[in-house]
């Protein structure tokens, strides 16, 4: 993959349940011969004991035109198979996936936590760059008591080869990783 840019819009609903809207933009570069029909994206449907109430809003190309996709479930994930079984993709392709979830914050006695794996650890291809922007609603932004942290590397590693910055954009706090 050339890149992944993800925007996470985190808020609370009227019942104080966390809401998450996600917009992911994957840029894949395929060979110029018939090899690939698209990509698969596995999105979690559960976190710990919580059912995340995942809803796919759209799957589009770089021109906001809907892409064909099918879904299947595997290991507490909804897997999107994006592409056409009858045609190959070549060159640079953009896949923008928009979805929503609920109940993504874990509440503890001393603190609350939103723990998210931006691009997962099951990809066969490397990513040139990965950027995540977390847009916090005002009611959540005021409750941040610690500096957000990020980790990089393979599953189980805890390297921090990444940077974290925070800025105000309108009434939201945006954390960029």
Regions found by a protein language model. Name each.
Residues 1-177:
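Lumenal/extracellular ectodomains and adaptor appendage modules
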């Amino acid at each position: 993959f050339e890149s992944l840019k993800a925007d996470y819009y985190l808020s609370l609903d009227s019942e104080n349940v966390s809401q998450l809207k996600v917009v992911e933009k994957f840029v894949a570069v395929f060979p110029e011969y018939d090899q690939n029909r698209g990509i698969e994206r596995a999105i979690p449907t559960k976190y710990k004991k919580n059912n995340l109430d995942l809803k796919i809003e759209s799957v589009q190309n770089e021109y906001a035109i809907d892409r064909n996709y099918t879904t299947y479930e595997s290991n507490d994930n909804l897997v999107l198979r994006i592409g056409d079984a009858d045609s190959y993709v070549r060159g640079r392709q953009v896949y923008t996936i928009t979805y929503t979830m609920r109940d993504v914050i874990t509440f503890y006695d001393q603190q609350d936590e939103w723990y998210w794996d931006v691009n997962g650890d099951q990809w066969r291809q490397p990513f040139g760059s990965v950027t995540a922007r977390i847009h916090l609603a005002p009611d959540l932004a005021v409750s941040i008591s610690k500096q957000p942290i990020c980790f990089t590397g393979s599953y189980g590693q805890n390297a921090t080869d990444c940077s974290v910055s925070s800025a105000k954009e309108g009434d939201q706090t945006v954390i960029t990783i």
